[in-house]
């Protein structure tokens, strides 16, 4: 028993030392001063040290219809509660979740006390433009994100605060954009207008050029017949799927040097300039489901190319890659060419031009009489890269695989991790 006493002493000293460190950290790091008898902090730490998240005193409150979690003291969750009106919002709330309700109006009093709001999610409700009081959002000088998608809006919700960075208006009935709608929105980086009723006349006058920091623009599933004019130089991701665009001006992309990804599938493109996509930063290009009859020049940094469901009868590799540069390889890794009118596989010369290519998806092809045929090659061809070959030199370089679903690559919202990190 005597030998255990020193252990008890050491353990007691260790506990005192650790506790003292925690106390020093709490005051030194959080308050940066010695506590006084009459000092009362605005918030205190939750008893569960694992979370380390502050929670506000009960006096700040929470709407009775909603839930305000202790670990996220500035968030209020009122989603999916069959609400017909916006509840009272405490002053300290910064993130407000009201999606999936039956809210029909946003009145001048809806956010009268909530001056610190940074994000409002009103998606999946029944809001109409006429039921949004003028200037109700513009008064929120800290607002950064506004979700109004999946409602019944007929007009753009103008005016909006200068602080706004992300604006989601998809799945509405918007058909007009006033010339002053984008005034003051100098910090918007992401604008989603997919699934509306926008036409060429709606975007005339280069209305979108006012968004000087815009990086992502979604205009899919509208009524556009030509490329949207006056897009800002800052744009990196452009979605134009499911419109009726039939041509692209030859110098159109010269004004978009930072473009990383372009999705213009399900349109009516037939003849496009040979080097129209000669963009040094372009990584993903989807021109599937058009009426293209031949391939085009492939920029050096392009990695994913989708040509499915066009009218292509043969692919001339020298058009895609007119010259070889052993010091600067092309980066193309994935090519999809199913549902075209190919009669034979692509020439093996493609692997000299694009040495990094991993996969070519041929799928089924369409014959002149409308029947589907399969080429005398694997439906899905994969090619090992150098690292895989080093691991297993004996493994066959081709194998069959399943078709990568179009939905995975063709979502109108950009879901690539790199995009999310950028925006």
UniProtKB/Swiss-Prot annotation:
PTM info: Glycosylated; contains keratan sulfate.
Keywords from the UniProt entry: Cell adhesion, Disulfide bond, Extracellular matrix, Glycoprotein, Leucine-rich repeat, Proteoglycan, Repeat, Secreted, Signal, Sulfation
Any one Pfam family match given in the protein's UniProt record, by short name: LRRNT
Major site of localization recorded for this protein: secreted
A GO BP annotation: regulation of bone mineralization
Residues carrying covalently attached carbohydrate according to the record: 113, 121, 187, 242, 278, 316
InterPro entries assigned to the protein according to its UniProt record, in alphabetical order: Leu-rich_rpt, Leu-rich_rpt_typical-subtyp, LRR_dom_sf, LRRNT, SLRP
Placement of LRR repeats on the sequence: 92-113, 116-129, 142-164, 165-184, 187-207, 213-233, 234-255, 258-279, 281-294, 301-322, 331-353
SUPFAM superfamilies recorded: L domain-like
Sulfotyrosine modifications at: 22, 25, 31, 39, 51, 77, 413-414
LRRNT domain residues: 53-91
Expressing tissues: Osteoblast and odontoblast. Expressed in femoral bone and calvaria tissues. Detected in femoral head, rib, tendon and bone marrow.
Gene3D superfamilies, per database record: Ribonuclease Inhibitor (3.80.10.10)
Amino acid composition bias (Acidic residues), ranges on this chain: 385-394
GO cellular component, one term: extracellular space
Keyword Secreted: yes
Region entry Disordered, spans: 383-408
Annotated family: Belongs to the small leucine-rich proteoglycan (SLRP) family. SLRP class II subfamily.
Primary role: May be implicated in biomineralization processes. Has a function in binding of osteoblasts via the alpha(V)beta(3)-integrin.
Protein name: Osteomodulin
UniProt source species: Rattus norvegicus (Rat)
